[in-house]
């Protein structure tokens, strides 16, 4: 039995392409050549596949909600957990799940998993070099002390030469960065810099102090720390903070595998499909970390709903819940009086097309047997042919 023969047999079947390919490969691997056996395997696979399909009229949204919500009650409330990396805190459990479905613009602990190209991933030194290029360095992180000198009427920076060397910087680099950000006269005394302004005063110097501390010298903005970890036969970088757009520009970074837990950032840089995949992955990983297993199709349902308009929207009154077409459905969720008052003032009409609004008015819902209309012929007489 050849692959072409199997493809021909499966050509008009209801199986999806991926399942067809997997089935063909399995039959060839097991070296099943008898045609009647192959036909039986294909028939049984089709029957098994059809049994897994959703029945027409099934309330898939309710099933997805209870399938995710019930395990959610068992999740811990721990906000932080050392996720395999000793010095890195990552939000897990229920707080992380809430962050995902709320489509927060900034997670409480943004982090990136940065994979390296073939040239860099096996060499510790090269991986360390990439980490140094990514890790954000400001003036404060390479200084022993930054203070206001009242006697000399200036801001004094005492540089840590060891820190400068370890981050691949020089005193000249620091001076250049400060000059590019602020109009100051700088006096250089080896590892001590005196920053002077035109009209010095205690108030003016203190006002500039936080700005001097925060001046960016090197690396990617928002990436506070990068940790190198060896996994199997390659080095992987874990960052505290996220900036996927700028990290992709760093030499040695594998842009096809590098990820972030900031879903809105993924949407802005890689698009809505990537954001949808990230929502599914993050929810699955969050549940998996708690030892809970939920069918991915329920998670896909939530992700599809959040991304259906081309932007990631939260599930709640500020997103999907507050944008329903039906007035009664919106009122049933949250802020009841507000929605009813607004609708009556504008003269809205509810067509009663959904589930919630039909339940409110006591009508049958369009689900299960309710989605089928039965037509009766009044002229029909028993025994007569139609």
UniProtKB/Swiss-Prot annotation:
Domain of life assignment: Archaea
Keywords per UniProt: Cytoplasm, DNA-binding, DNA-directed RNA polymerase, Nucleotidyltransferase, Transcription, Transferase
Protein function: DNA-dependent RNA polymerase (RNAP) catalyzes the transcription of DNA into RNA using the four ribonucleoside triphosphates as substrates. Forms part of the jaw domain.
Enzyme Commission identifier(s): 2.7.7.6
Organism, as annotated: Methanococcus maripaludis (strain C7 / ATCC BAA-1331)
One Gene Ontology term, aspect cellular component: cytoplasm
Native organism taxonomy: Archaea, Methanobacteriati, Methanobacteriota, Methanomada group, Methanococci
Protein name: DNA-directed RNA polymerase subunit Rpo1C
GO molecular function per UniProt: DNA binding; DNA-directed RNA polymerase activity
Primary site of residence: cytoplasm
Recorded family membership: Belongs to the RNA polymerase beta' chain family.
CDD domains named in the record: RNAP_A (cd06528)
